[in-house]
Amino acid sequence: MLQPKRMKFRKMHKGRNRGYAAGDSVSFGTFGLKSVGRGRMTARQIEAARRAMTRAVKRQGKIWIRVFPDKPITEKPLEVRQGKGKGNVEYWVCQIQPGRVLYEMEGVPESVAREAFELAASKLPFKTTFVTRTVM
C-alpha cells in the first residue's frame, strides 16, 4: 500500500479539507476519473480502485495514479481512556477536493475506460465523473 517513505514529523493535526483542487486536468493519459465531491481517500481505497480498473481492462493500456496518501491518521486503541497523548498512526489518507483527477488511462477504447472507471468509482467514498483529455 502507498505511504511516504519518511516524514519530518510522524503525526499531523486533523486540519480542514477546503478549497478546490490542483491537478484538475488530464495530463498523462487520454481518459481520467475526476472527483466531484470532497473527502478523504485511504491507501486501501486507492489500491482497491486500481485493482478493479486493472482487471476491467485485462491489463491492457496504461494507468496512472494521480493521488498519493501523505497524511497520517491516528487512532487510540479500543477501551483506552482519553489523555496520555495522541494515538498511533493507523492508516494514511490523501485529502480530495472537487475537481481533482484521481486516475488516468490510455491505450484502451473509451467504452472500456468508462466501464473500468465506473468499477473504480464504486470503491470510492465520494462522487466522481469521467473526463477526457482536451487538446488546445
UniProtKB/Swiss-Prot annotation:
<keyword id="KW-0699">rRNA-binding</keyword>
<dbReference type="InterPro" id="IPR020798">
    <property type="entry name" value="Ribosomal_uL16_CS"/>
</dbReference>
<dbReference type="GO" id="GO:0003735">
    <property type="term" value="F:structural constituent of ribosome"/>
</dbReference>
<dbReference type="InterPro" id="IPR016180">
    <property type="entry name" value="Ribosomal_uL16_dom"/>
</dbReference>
<comment type="similarity">
    <text>Belongs to the universal ribosomal protein uL16 family.</text>
</comment>
<dbReference type="Pfam" id="PF00252">
    <property type="entry name" value="Ribosomal_L16"/>
</dbReference>
<comment type="function">
    <text>Binds 23S rRNA and is also seen to make contacts with the A and possibly P site tRNAs.</text>
</comment>
<dbReference type="GO" id="GO:0019843">
    <property type="term" value="F:rRNA binding"/>
</dbReference>
<dbReference type="InterPro" id="IPR047873">
    <property type="entry name" value="Ribosomal_uL16"/>
</dbReference>
<comment type="subunit">
    <text>Part of the 50S ribosomal subunit.</text>
</comment>
<keyword id="KW-0694">RNA-binding</keyword>
<dbReference type="InterPro" id="IPR000114">
    <property type="entry name" value="Ribosomal_uL16_bact-type"/>
</dbReference>
<dbReference type="InterPro" id="IPR036920">
    <property type="entry name" value="Ribosomal_uL16_sf"/>
</dbReference>
<keyword id="KW-0689">Ribosomal protein</keyword>
<protein>
    <recommendedName>
        <fullName>Large ribosomal subunit protein uL16</fullName>
    </recommendedName>
</protein>
<keyword id="KW-0687">Ribonucleoprotein</keyword>
<dbReference type="GO" id="GO:0022625">
    <property type="term" value="C:cytosolic large ribosomal subunit"/>
</dbReference>
<dbReference type="GO" id="GO:0006412">
    <property type="term" value="P:translation"/>
</dbReference>
<keyword id="KW-0820">tRNA-binding</keyword>
<dbReference type="GO" id="GO:0000049">
    <property type="term" value="F:tRNA binding"/>
</dbReference>
